[in-house]
Amino acid sequence: MDKFQGYLEFDGARQQSFLYPLFFREYIYVLAYDHGLNRLNRNRYIFLENADYDKKYSSLITKRLILRMYEQNRLIIPTKDVNQNSFLGHTSLFYYQMISVLFAVIVEIPFSLRLGSSFQGKQLKKSYNLQSIHSIFPFLEDKLGHFNYVLDVLIPYPIHLEILVQTLRYRVKDASSLHFFRFCLYEYCNWKNFYIKKKSILNPRFFLFLYNSHVCEYESIFFFLRKRSSHLRSTSYEVLFERIVFYGKIHHFFKVFVNNFPAILGLLKDPFIHYVRYHGRCILATKDTPLLMNKWKYYFVNLWQCYFSVWFQSQKVNINQLSKDNLEFLGYLSSLRLNPLVVRSQMLENSFLIDNVRIKLDSKIPISSIIGSLAKDKFCNVLGHPISKATWTDSSDSDILNRFVRICRNISHYYSGSSKKKNLYRIKYILRLCCVKTLARKHKSTVRTFLKRLGSGLLEEFLTGEDQVLSLIFPRSYYASKRLYRVRIWYLDILYLNDLVNHE
């Protein structure tokens, strides 16, 4: 990375024109790149000439391949049979795969440098905790309680290939690299039938880069309009002050009206909008009226259709009222719940009760969808009744038990932030009984006979180490009173969601 830093230290006109020397300079033989920013692979790899092509790619071979392709009299035209179209002793699809990976690695360099420069001079302690999926929920608990409407948007993808090329053109000024990128991209589309049949040759890193570039372009337009809209000459909530002088009057309000109008101050300090993007979706939480929410919906539909040339249906943008509707967010069902509080106050001989209502974000487990996923993977039927896992009966007893314990712990770990643990106990019960039925089927016995022979110690593995750790963290009286099961716990080590069955 330090070696390539010099290419990025030119003036603004040449800052992004670095792909050409990286592709064609003779001394580019080894390219070391940090995969820590890539969620698909968090190890550090070095691209060497003799690397294993299944996991690593040689920049030297790729450079030779590019030169050889430019020396050809004609371009490679794909045929119906992938084996008939060979190039340098290998299929052309193999080389398109290798080139696309190296292209994604090179183009990611300015993004990684930009991200690193954004953290310079800032003291971020334990920033790795912010990468956790659960770290989003504590922020939402503080923010969503002040909002009443949420706009749930499904980001459309894919779009036209030429739109992706034009998006990248704003960041890369090298025309040769853009033409080569367009050529490889269209070749990938010509081979799309083979991608469906052979999933092992998919290049998730290349398409992840395209998706991130596409979303970055969309968000840059959205945030620009959002920033401009906050300074328009319009009324602000109930206080009827022009927003153009909104920030200048906040200090005056704190001095004069802090004792008389605390509710108005709360409205003034509320952010205009709260934006969260996750898993190809985004949500916009705001305190606007239904009319303004429909205007935001109309804006998104026209943005995708007019600017990105994508047919975007209005049904993909849902307006949810948090006080009435449930918001499906990262596997949870979130909604606002009124939590009444009664405070007893006593002054000398007089005592009185104060009724307060606190708005709290309630996160629940979507039991129906989880049971549907378990039924799809043959852990239970559609009604939630456990059944034996027939495909696992060929494994050893310890392997079967470890698989069930791992799945049970992962689900318990992720849904520990639920406000109601009753549904979580039901899921654990399904997995425990499914494990017993699977072992009984393997040994050609009934469940009752199998449990009598081995005893109840078989299911002790399902008592996760999580409960043991929590018993050490919280006071013993607190843990013994079972109040811990009503507490929401967010973990900061969940970086990504694994497959339910195939996770090792």
Curated annotation (Swiss-Prot):
Molecular function terms from GO: RNA binding
Region forming the signal peptide: none
UniProt-listed Pfam families: Intron_maturas2 (PF01348), MatK_N (PF01824)
Subcellular location: Plastid, Chloroplast
GO cellular component: chloroplast
Record keywords: Chloroplast, mRNA processing, Plastid, RNA-binding, tRNA processing
Effect of mutating K3Q: In strain: cv. Cvi-1
Mutagenesis / variant outcome for changing F119L: In strain: cv. Per-1 and cv
Keyword RNA-binding: yes
InterPro entries: Domain_X, Maturase_MatK, Maturase_MatK_N
GO terms (BP aspect): mRNA processing; RNA splicing; tRNA processing
Similarity annotation: Belongs to the intron maturase 2 family. MatK subfamily.
Function (record text): Usually encoded in the trnK tRNA gene intron. Probably assists in splicing its own and other chloroplast group II introns.
Listed name of the protein: Maturase K
Source species of the chain: Arabidopsis thaliana
